[in-house]
């Protein structure tokens, strides 16, 4: 095996060019076995094998600096830069993260996981190189839908003025996570169709030199192209036409499904753990499709992640023009929603919590200042969500709950969520965001009759005394568990409250609690600093009421175990009861 002898890029250069396809197959074989057992980003890495080999064959990493956009396609890069055991040995699968990580290797320059940042980051590396009078190539690798992000275009616009070495590899696999959208990708398609020769060329229009490689999975063709641009004294774009999922038939056929995979059977491609249970994604899709049938003003919006709302390809076709994918452009999605709402439409925007930070300015400026009645639903904003440091869902409460005019809601069950949607999609007075609970969806079959238009009215679900536990969203179930344990262990009949609202206080209820309670406990699925519980504590201020806030510490966690994090933050019923009894 060639791969077994690769301990760094210098070993790649020792292999004859006509033998490199054999190593490419070895890389795919290793990726296939690992993915079948461990899961991970699949299609992006299978499509980038030859390009990665060619990069390390031609350039001198780490002197020549390679920056991968999103870096979800960096598995072959890691295999060629001293980390192959993490892909060859099951015992070492967890030795590396799913993204580039400077703590792992000198060949990784940034910890990244969000799209469209590579050109700007690499431009910074190039600018610093020039200021210090150094040499060396700087390469940004971007594609897989990332060009649709505003920062990518901003970076291209700025980079044209550098007038020094800067190489941008555009990995064009004709896909984002799902299909591509927008005029930019029409131009890429035209460039592919004309072998890069059409006069209508986005990159040339921006003043950039341009090279096209039609055989983007031909390592010899790539090496030839990269050698031509190596040590260039100005910015050049190398546009490579690749096949997402190349080398594994199911992934080539169903590119969207195989963007990311869990463990699967190699022979059939079928997942080992096929989750057919109803979840918030499927519930959302079913709700919106039904609403669309009777109301042409309803619009579902995604920013490149349609299945987060349950909109698989067939569901998107069913929705027709009432489903909009703006590409990986969260800012545009929010501003678009505001415009639709102002002109009488009923926009619904679904987004992962980790990507909410990219929307902050538009939520504040374009939506909330204008009081546009959009509905924005936040997925995986939870300790139970994605656990990579680049994709944490802990920060949406402090971010969104402090924007004026926004009503931010937190259901605990399917029924509460649907009731909130019924209200939000029809009301025209407020921008509304809904934070979905983490973990498996809970459905209790109850009929929710609450009028959410009467803002900031909490619900007392169990009346007690001395101790009141306010459990927000995900942790409403934990509030009930802690109350039950308090009764069993100390005979304390605690009050349990479902607050529903993240953005406002039920001051009448909180004041009433002073009559026969001495301690209020708040539980929230997010960072405590600037969060929900702090607002409760501030309300009680100088009163005699003790307030105990439970949530997460302000820190970046990476590949964490959810149960361990909960215990570390005393977010178990046993720990909460122990804490309460220690101060009683």
Positions of PLM-derived features:
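Non-catalytic terminal/interface segments that mediate subunit docking, oligomerization
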Residues: 248-357, 362-372, 470-473
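Cofactor-binding active-site loop characterized by glycine-rich and histidine/acidic residues
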Residues: 41-162, 298, 303, 312-313, ...
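Glycine-rich ThDP/TPP pyrophosphate-binding loop and its adjacent helix/strand module
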Residues: 108-264, 270-277, 282-284, 406-517
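N-terminal amphipathic, basic-rich helices that act as targeting or association modules
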Residues: 1-79, 215
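A glycine-rich helix N-cap at a beta->alpha junction
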Residues: 86-96, 161-175, 368-380
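Glycine/charged-rich beta-loop-alpha catalytic/anionic-binding loops adjacent to active sites
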Residues: 29-36, 95-111, 133-139, 312-327, ...
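Peripheral docking tails and interdomain loops at the edges
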Residues: 263, 271-274, 385-387, 398, ...
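Active-site nucleophile and cofactor-binding loops and adjacent substrate-binding regions
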Residues: 39-48, 67-72, 101-120, 142-146, ...
